[in-house]
């Protein structure tokens, strides 16, 4: 029988049908090759938006800089970055007037954070520009390299472990005449292999000392490395994102902490909360506008889009905002917070890897590094690239481009949200002094504007006033891409509002399925995703039950662990059948060992091992979870692990799941080919840290481990702990006198070695 699909929707409210419009099947696009072109686009565009500003030259590094602040007022609708200082300050003052004490209190809270934050805060984060090696590294390695170089250049405040003291070193490093760094390099030589008698290339990794003069060091400290943003859907062109070095990161962290504290107190801010909390907060603003637009008023909502938000923001504007926000605070605090915007107004964008050329006829490939773009003959390039290079040339120094205006993606999300909210705040009747008024929501560059007025002319006037006010602070609302509708239907940060936020379950579809970490984690993540979607995304019981069955099926196919009594033949079926036959309580077998599935929608919160524990054979239990079984991995597993799940749209989300260490929680070994590359030095450093941390954990089991508050080093802490433990063990008779004496002797030797060093 044919079913008319429209019948399916007869009983469904229109807004619930949004999941059927899901556009994102298949893999998102990834970028290949170099990001140099995209970065040049960003730099050139940013300068174009501010082209009527004043040019100056940075006296320290000789970089040309463009300052659009207080530039000409816009005469057309083209995007521009000419923010007016007095307008920004006025918006800040009004924000403070409507929220008495907001800046004062946020400053006090931030001051407390600044005093307490430890340097290891900077190890969070993924790729970071490592200025010592002039390329990207994991954050922890980049921080360690920076501290190592600082210490070898007599900058030692950081030894206290406080982030604030590390930043003192950063400030001091900028005044030094030169900095000595250690770089890794690669030597290649051809040698004859004894076994095969063939010639092979042998690579050795060396470390060499290099001196950077003040100018070179400053350029590196102010450099943002650029990469291409991957996995962006719905765009034809890729775009560049930036990753700053360790000198900038600490200062940015404190500014963002302050801005975060302010955002938490603003009802129009979509940051820093997320998920259901965010929906509730936003729904309040909408409710307020709808109840206030009594029968006499019209209410319209704009689903807003800003043109090139980051490229029209300006660090100098942020400096003005911070100066105002912290105006009654102690001098040291104001100085620390003003450093991030100052460094950003002197930033340099690293152009990345450069261009790859290949000659089809001669089968040759050659890399033109970014450093050569300043001098190379342009006849080799196509027209569009030629134009880009010509435009960027005056800005180049050592393969980096001077980029004073603009913010680069994702650096000051919180602070720019404060700026956006301050304009929304000006929509109150007491400021507009007319019949229209507005309010709205702001989350970084995304906004929704709700305008109320007695008639359509009033709505139009309100929108125009908002548009012009934004222009004065460097925010460019796009008239082409923004959409106005009666209040009650709009979209904000991928949340769709129709008389309440609609659960767009299809957005979560890509996160269903088998993650591919290991059998244990995958089972746990799979059921947690289903559970979370029942809680947050209107996933109904019948659909959830179906999702669960599909997941189990998918899981069995992925790990070839079909039930022991199945007819399906796979590589593992022989072993699993044998296990099935010799197991008395077959329900006790995990799904990954060919057991049946006991999950249903009521028990998704229980890890599978716990669910089946009472049903397991004793000897199976003993193999599965025995800490003495070499295949049971206990090192890496905490009781709660976190996985990264990818929704279809928006950032990857971190999701927590319960983890139980069993023979199935294996960790894949690292690819060995890294050992032959110049990354090897990095790997050795990483292993050294791992060993130190493991040793430290032996001395301080997690129950007694508190963050060190004093300024003792790890070694001192371990030595004093060893002495205390030894004394207790000796006095309680757990160790003999000779052993006690030997421990004390070792401790003294270690201290002696430290003194000599």
Curated annotation (Swiss-Prot):
Q: Where in the cell is it found?
A: Host nucleus; Host cytoplasm
One Pfam family this sequence matches: Flu_PB1
Q: Which GO terms describe its biological process?
A: DNA-templated transcription; symbiont-mediated suppression of host gene expression; symbiont-mediated suppression of host mRNA transcription via inhibition of RNA polymerase II activity; viral RNA genome replication; viral transcription
Q: How is it modified after translation?
A: Phosphorylated by host PRKCA.
**Residues that span the membrane, as ranges:** none
Query: Gene Ontology cellular component?
Result: host cell cytoplasm; host cell nucleus
Q: What class of enzyme is it?
A: transferase
All residue ranges annotated as the RdRp catalytic domain in the record: 286-483
What InterPro entries does the annotation carry? RNA-dir_pol_NSvirus (IPR007099), RNA_pol_PB1_influenza (IPR001407)
Family label? Belongs to the influenza viruses polymerase PB1 family.
Q: What is this protein called?
A: RNA-directed RNA polymerase catalytic subunit
Q: Which organism is it from?
A: Influenza A virus (strain A/Equine/London/1416/1973 H7N7)
